A protein has these predicted regions:
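An anion/phosphate-binding loop that grips the pyrophosphate of nucleotide cofactors and donors
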Residues: 2
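N-terminal Rossmann-like NAD(P) cofactor-binding subdomain of oxidoreductases
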Residues: 5-63
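Acidic, glycine-rich segments within the central catalytic cores of soluble metabolic enzymes
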Residues: 42, 51-53, 57-177
Length: 177
């Protein structure tokens, strides 16, 4: 018998196939069961999902497209929702294995593509109390967030300029003066 079961089908399909957590737990009570899905818990939980829907819901296209600065949504090529969900699943399973080693108990764990995509834009999320805060925004050309944190086209190619500390700003100013 398996110690861990992981799948990414919709949970109602797992129930129909008899491979849902409750059915398998009846066979192996200490089973670790990881269900990965497209959407967060709630009204969309049972809907099919994919990398791009997760990116849209998390705001990746908005942020990557510099829409706050008048840009347009940008299609995400990273597939971070899919790969990130795999990483989240691996972490959840490792935590469950640790719990099982300490307690002898199996458990149900779950992750979602949209959760992985939220990690991709975690720099723009609100505080836990729901209040907002000033945050860097990608410009509409998707080249940077500020004059000293941007990509510039030069006669020799592209330059990535990142000047993050005040003393380096002063040093750059001295060199350019």
């Amino acid at each position: 018998t398996a110690d861990v079961v992981q799948h990414n089908m919709r949970y109602d399909a797992a129930i129909r196939l008899g491979v849902d957590y409750e059915s398998l737990k009846a066979i192996k009570p200490d089973l670790i069961y990881c269900h990965t899905r497209g959407h967060e818990r709630g009204p969309r939980e049972k809907l099919p999902g994919n990398d791009q829907t997760g990116a849209c819901l998390a705001g990746v296209q908005y942020e990557d497209g510099g829409m706050a600065d008048g840009g347009k949504p940008l299609w995400s090529l990273t597939s971070f929702g899919d790969t990130g969900n795999g990483f989240l699943s691996a972490i959840a399973i490792m935590q469950a294995l640790y719990h099982k080693a300490k307690s002898g108990e199996g458990q149900f764990v779950s992750t979602a593509i949209v959760y992985a995509q939220l990690l991709n834009v975690s720099h723009v999320l609100a505080r836990p109390d729901g209040s907002g805060f000033d945050r860097p925004r990608l410009d509409k050309d998707q080249r940077g967030m500020a004059a000293l944190d941007s990509l510039y086209e030069t006669s020799d190619g592209w330059l990535a300029l990142v000047v993050a500390k005040d003393d380096r700003v002063l040093a750059l100013d001295a060199k350019m003066s």
